[in-house]
Regions:
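A short C-terminal boundary segment appended to hydrolase-like catalytic domains
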Residues: 128-178
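Acidic, metal/ion-coordinating pockets
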Residues: 1-149
């Protein structure tokens, strides 16, 4: 399935992932083919809307964004996805290792990014807009440094190590990166 629906405290959220064009370009020999991210996002959101009764739609993006609100921001894949697929409430951005201290708002869509290498955890709180639109607004967003003051979760750490080793063995070593 192209998406998953999770329910928490009576709120149903559909979540789906995207791989961006520039991310795919880093692995041209992988043999993987991806649709255009904007096209894939639009198709997935339409499918969610026709098949599910959800309160919000969240995109886990490996497309990327930039740190400032310059003209370059408007050219990033995540920004363009937010413009072209306005039904998405939240885009959690990755790939470019961007640290967004503040969320970027594009219409009713918010873009957040917590940097790279598990250095931070983003905490975003969405609340109903209360205007009858059924949309959500970002009421708070903060970055939590994952430093020595935050205890490791043994199960998460074990999974992370497992997937890093798998990526090194199965992919990166073939291209001299491990």
């Amino acid at each position: 399935k192209e998406y998953a629906v999770i329910e928490h405290d009576g709120i149903r959220a559909a979540m789906f992932g995207l791989m961006g064009e520039s991310a795919v370009d880093y692995a041209p020999e992988s043999g993987l083919l991806f649709k255009d991210a904007k096209e894939a996002a639009a198709e997935t959101v339409e499918k969610i809307k026709s098949e599910e009764d959800v309160d919000m739609i969240i995109c886990l993006s490996h497309c990327g964004t930039v740190e400032d609100e310059s003209d370059v921001m408007e050219e990033t894949e995540d920004y363009l996805i937010a413009q072209e697929v306005p039904e998405i409430d939240l885009i959690i951005s990755g790939h470019t290792h961007t640290l967004l201290e503040e969320a970027v708002q594009v219409g009713d869509t918010y873009i957040v990014s917590s940097g790279a290498y598990n250095a931070n955890m983003g905490h975003a709180v969405l609340e109903p807009k209360g205007d009858g639109s059924g949309r959500y607004m970002l009421s708070s967003y903060k970055l939590i440094p994952l430093d020595e003051t935050v205890a490791d979760d043994a199960a998460v750490k074990e999974e992370l190590v497992k997937y890093r080793e798998l990526a090194d063995e199965e992919y990166f070593s073939e291209y001299g990166f491990s």
